[in-house]
Each structure stands twice: as structure tokens, then as C-alpha cells.
Design a protein with these regions (language model features):
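Conserved ABC transporter NBD signature motif
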Residues: 56-67, 71-72
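ABC ATPase "signature
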Residues: 210-211
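Conserved ABC ATPase "signature" region
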Residues: 77, 96, 100-123
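Catalytic Walker B motif of ABC-type/P-loop ATPase nucleotide-binding domains
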Residues: 152-156
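Conserved ABC ATPase signature
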Residues: 88, 127-134
Length: 244
């Protein structure tokens, strides 16, 4: 369980995340959806201990985000927007390298499991820098699973991929659902709708709506999720304009 209370991140005069309040259930695949600059990646970076919040409190599996950050790092992992692979190592070398860093017991079994899950057999001997975008993303996520994290952060996992590669990666992410808690950021509406148990819509640093895709469609009174998202964002922008 992740409990977030008034989480805020400020960069000088810019409020990147503004008093975020949210609970994410154990085993849930939760998506943060928003346009560029909405605060999704900043939120992920705070929750994964990469940057400190300006204020607020976060409880992750009964651990305090700031006070217990070293313990939290043992139970989480992240696949960032920029693929986290060693470009001059082969796919297999990348997996063994990260297994060594995390001191994974029975690492051969874990590596075989990940190779099978992500269908990496045919590219094992290729250097990471020669891989297609789809395979680079697969390898990056495989690496983030090497330590069996209880919580996995996927920051824009299909960013820049063609539609075939994107759908292929969705199938893998679907297989992970329920086995670990997943927090995914995306600006692809179809991705959030297809994969998520629940979706949080962010705009200008704030969480402005929360629910399943069906609940959000119902709240917005639209025919589909894309129209619901657009309406929710536009109404929030108009509300902020009127306040100003």
C-alpha cells in the first residue's frame, strides 16, 4: 500500500507537484495520465526516492519515504523514460551485470525467467545500443524486475515506440499485473485505459480526477475515454482561468 499525503515538489517558482493526495493498493496497476508537464514524472521520481519532496508525507509499505529511503530502495525499482541499459554490453551481459549488483541468489534462474517473459532469446548476444526501441524498452523493464521488486515504477514505458511495439509491450505488462504493484506514467490514453486498474489524471501538478476508465467516462458524460480525458483537462483549465 502506498499512502500519499499533500506531496509537493517546488522548483524555485515552479510548482511541479501540488499537494498530491492518493492511495495505491497492493497489487494494483495504477496509471498517472496527463499531458506533458503535468507532474507525472516528478511524482514517480519522488516516490522512487530519486528526488526529495519539498513537503508532504508518503508511506510505502509502512515505511516513511524520507526517513526509510534506504529500506524502500530494497523493495522498489524503476524503468525510467531513458532506457536504463548499458549500451556497450550485450542483452545477456546487461542482465548478469544487474543481477550481480543486486546480489541476486539463483541469478541464472531469474535471468532465464526474464528472458522468456520478454522474449529476448533472439537478441541475447546483441549489444544494447544495436537494439530496436521495442527491445530496448523490454530490456529496461526486465532489468527493473531483476530484484523482484514489490513496487515497480514504469515511466512512459512505450514512449517513442511504434504501434506494434507498443501493443507487444502491453502484453508483457499485462502479465505482471497482480504480481507486483505497478505505477505507470503515460500520456497515451489507450495505454492507460487498456492496462490500468485505476487512473489518476494530472494537470498542472494537481491530481484532478481519479477512477477506473469506465468511472471517468461516466463522470465526464462522454462516449469514450479519450473524450472524457479531453473534457476533464479542458474543464480544469477553464476553471483555473476563471479563478485567475
Amino acid at each position: 500500500m502506498i499512502k500519499i499525503n499533500n506531496l509537493t515538489k517546488k522548483y524555485k517558482d515552479k510548482l511541479a507537484v501540488d499537494n498530491l493526495n492518493l492511495e495505491i493498493k497492493t497489487g494494483e496497476l495504477f496509471s498517472l495520465l496527463g499531458t506533458n508537464g503535468a507532474g507525472k514524472t516528478t511524482t514517480i521520481k519522488m516516490l522512487s526516492t530519486l528526488i526529495l519532496p519539498t513537503s508532504g508525507e508518503v508511506d510505502i509499505n509502512n515505511l516513511d519515504l524520507v526517513k526509510d529511503s534506504s529500506k524502500i530502495k530494497e523493495i522498489i525499482n524503476i524503468s525510467p523514460q531513458e532506457t536504463a541499459v548499458a549500451s556497450n554490453l550485450t542483452v545477456l551481459e546487461n542482465l548478469y551485470f544487474m543481477a550481480g549488483i543486486y546480489q541476486i541468489p539463483n541469478k541464472e534462474d531469474k535471468i532465464k525467467e526474464l528472458i522468456k517473459l520478454f522474449k529476448l532469446e533472439e537478441v541475447l548476444k546483441q549489444k544494447a545500443k544495436t537494439l530496436s526501441g521495442g527491445y530496448q524498452r523490454k530490456l529496461s523493464i526486465a532489468i527493473s524486475l531483476i530484484n523482484n521488486p514489490k513496487i515497480l515504477f514504469l515511466d512512459e514505458p512505450t514512449l517513442g515506440l511504434d504501434v506494434i511495439s507498443r501493443h507487444d509491450l502491453w502484453k508483457v505488462i499485462e502479465l505482471l499485473k497482480g504480481k507486483t504493484t505497478i505505477i505507470l506514467t503515460t500520456h497515451y490514453m489507450e495505454e492507460a485505459e487498456v492496462l490500468s486498474d485505476r487512473i489518476g489524471i494530472m494537470n498542472k501538478g494537481k491530481l484532478i480526477e481519479l477512477g477506473t476508465s469506465k468511472e471517468l467516462i461516466k463522470k465526464a458524460k462522454t462516449k469514450n475515454f479519450e473524450d472524457a480525458f479531453i473534457k476533464i483537462i479542458e474543464e480544469d483549465n477553464n476553471e483555473n482561468t476563471n479563478i485567475c
